[in-house]
Amino acid sequence: MQNCLGIYIENNLIKYAKVSKDRDTFKVDAFGIRFFDNLNEAIKKIVEETYSFNTPISINLANERYLYYDIFALLSKNDIQKTVETEFETFCDENKYNQKAFETRYALVSNVQNKERIKAIQVIVNKIELNKQKQYLEKHNLSGILPIGTAIASITRFEKKENVLIVNMEEKTTITTIYDRQIYNVETIDHGSQEVLEKINRTENSMSKAYEICKGTTIYTANVIDDAKEQPHLEDIIPTLYQISQKIKEIVDESPVKISTVYLTGTLSVINNVDLYFQEFLPSADCKILKPSIVELNVTQINIKDYIEVNSAISLAMQSLGEGMQSLN
């Protein structure tokens, strides 16, 4: 049996999930969230509490960027690699970046608009940021540092020919476009849970309380009477959700293929009726909370909402165990 501890790290919040794999069956053995002042101590306690002293640990990249290159499909593998390198050099020259300051990986996907071309998705991250993250885990068994924009797709299995968006509303929001089981695009926007939690924290003076307020908040849609007295922090939440909804709408409207489903996950997905809120802006797609297939395949007494809170951590563990995109070069 294989296992992995997925740890999703934000500015002052950790989400973790220990996942085991037996053949094609996955199981969540332990999970949770934790606010922290000292990241090293928080990781140490999570490792101790989950008995993960020798368990491989997978964490998320910090402040990564996604670049896209259009490449002729008939090129050899070596020529494709050279083309990606040349495109990245051009990007660095145009932006006056030091090329050697970045660690890079790329994956190749089909170009749905032109069958004679392929699309290279390149993930880049500053080496200083990357080394900082490695230092946090230097006393533990670090197995991988993964971009959450691609890892989140490993949380469930999509139908063939299904075209979807995964909107991961964490500290920042990543919107992952998937066409026919292939990741096609990842966009990151600054509007996300950090924006909301910081607003609530200004009056509540507690980030953990702000998080619980989000979990207890219900968004009233056009068909339900709004009782603002019972929802004092809606004014802190709705503006961020609106900005996210407009970005999703833009992506759906400009997509070269019809998006059938928009899956919602991340911290802001625990707000009650958030799927109904987004549905009002996206009548052509079905808006759903993203449930990990790992839960649907296993009988459990745990509330599905508790699992959804840590989807990002589950996805990091699952990708390290062989699910999702495995072809980053």
Question: Which residues does each PLM region occupy?
Answer:
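Gly/Thr-rich phosphate-binding beta-strand-loop-beta motif of the actin/hexokinase/Hsp70
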Residues: 1-31, 58-62, 157-195, 199-202, ...
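N-terminal phosphate-binding loop and adjacent alpha-helix
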Residues: 25-51, 77-80
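Short glycine-rich phosphate-binding loop at a beta-alpha junction
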Residues: 52-65, 143-144, 256-268
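Active-site neighborhood for divalent-cation/phosphate handling
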Residues: 64-159, 294
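Glycine-rich phosphate-binding loop plus the immediately following alpha-helix
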Residues: 130-152, 180-226
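Glycine-rich phosphate-binding/hydrolytic loop that grips phosphoryl groups
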Residues: 151, 288-329
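Adenine-nucleotide phosphate-binding core of ATP-dependent small-molecule kinases
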Residues: 202-203, 212-261, 268
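Glycine-rich phosphate-binding loops at beta-strand->alpha-helix junctions
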Residues: 259-287
